[in-house]
Amino acid sequence: SRDTVNSYRLGASLLAALTLFMVSACSSDPETENVPAPSTSSPAPNPDSVRTQLDHAVDKTAKKYHAKVGVAISAGDDTIAVGDKGKGPVWSTIKVPIAIAALKDGADKSLVDLAIKESDNDAAYALWSQVKWREGSADKAVEELLEDYGSHADIHDTAFGYSTWSLKDQAVFGAELPCIEEADYVHKVLKDIVSWQKIGLSKEKRTRAKSGWGLDEDDNEYTLSLIHI
């Protein structure tokens, strides 16, 4: 549909504005820490400048596509959120903390590959079931995992795609994710999303991202969510 196509384009249109400011709360990536540093360095972006540029990008994109647009970025202690707060269903982005919780409970990594790389719903449900079997309540276990790292979500107890997880809370967790020992495998596979699942920020080679989209029946609008590290 037209709304779905616009969702793809909308995500891509924010890439240039965001790429320079995406940072992690942790130290360097183990895969790149041995790469020689450049001889010159640039000062860290000023938060006010970042907010101004994000405000401009969000406003421009929202007007162009007649859509609600929101962005949040975080470096752990510092978080900036502009535009829509992202109060609707989070869709498949919630598979990221579900996969982490499931791995902590002994889930098979092959299920994580399918659930994250291909966004396979059956694999994600198997991970969810693993957490429920070990913890008794999968929704509470995922909520507690997020809260341990300063993030909050209301996890739907049956249809987890309908969970709500604000953009600001997603950004906070995304900044912490590389620091979580149990999340190491999830962090790796986020870099290997299959081509037909790559949209918007997930097309950037130096990033890791998980997207989710669907029809928000409450508003009768298609929504696109993307957590990007």
What name fits each language-model region?
Residues 3-12:
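Bacterial N-terminal signal peptides that target proteins for export
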Residues 14-20:
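Hydrophobic alpha-helical targeting segments used for export or membrane insertion
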Residues 22-25:
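C-terminal motif of bacterial Sec signal peptides marking the signal peptidase cleavage site
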Residues 27-29:
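Bacterial signal peptide processing site
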Residues 31-38, 45-71, 76-78, 132-227:
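Penicillin-recognizing serine hydrolase domain
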Residues 74-79, 111-134:
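Acidic helix-start/capping segments at beta-turn-to-alpha-helix junctions
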Residues 87-107, 115:
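Active-site SXXK
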Residues 100-107, 129, 172-179:
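Short glycine/serine- and small hydrophobic-enriched flexible loop segments
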